[in-house]
Amino acid sequence: MRKILINHFNKAIYLYVLIGFGMSHAGSYDDFFKAIQIDDVRTIQQLLARGFDANTLNPQGQHGLLIAIKEPSLKVAQLLVSAPKVDLNILSASGESPLMLAALKGELDLAEKMVKKGADINKTGWTPLHYADSNGHVGIIKLLLENHAYIDAESPNGTTPLMMASLYGSPQAVKLLIDEGADPSLKNQQGLTALEFARRGSRPDAIELLSKTTRIKQADGKW
């Protein structure tokens, strides 16, 4: 009888510990994603110090670092990038990496940290350089090129960073790419060059830069 009681007692203790752990984990999970939304660095620091996984996904399958950059919750994003085992090459459902989002938003400090930690600069398809050029973030464009970003990287439909800069970016971004050797003669799957992108976007500065480059190359016999 005594042995039976001891067994029941041990099972009860085990269930109590198991339930307590589950409740604690659920609380930590909720706290983690709430802290990301409000840029609460202190809570994130405490959770990571207790062993919470920085790569935990929310119910929609979104990685905490991607959420932090999108919010933006930049203090939390900086902290998560510094976490020892964080996955810097995690992709969103639409194929965007943390570095791509930082490039799109012009977050140079964050991008520098990720590049130093080995974030993928030349991922297949759309790249961080495409994203930086689409908003004309010259500082990030320079950072990526200095770290061997492929200047004529092609998206799934053949669009290059120069095409994105010509349509959406700044004249400074277009000039930088041309000066660094981007090829204005390339065409995407629709047969459009960077110059035609600029014309479609009614971008007079980009049109002038690209037209001048085209004339020079044709005169030199390079095309």
Predicted features by range, described:
Residues 11-21:
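Bacterial N-terminal signal peptides
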Residues 34-39, 67-73, 101-107, 131-137, ...:
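Ankyrin repeat A-helix N-terminal signature
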Residues 27-63, 67:
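N-terminal segments that cap or nucleate solenoid repeat domains
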Residues 40-48, 73-82, 107-115, 137-146, ...:
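Ankyrin repeat structural motif
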Residues 2, 24-31, 147, 180, ...:
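Ankyrin-repeat-protein effector appendages
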Residues 58, 92, 122-125, 155, ...:
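Ankyrin repeat boundary/linker residues
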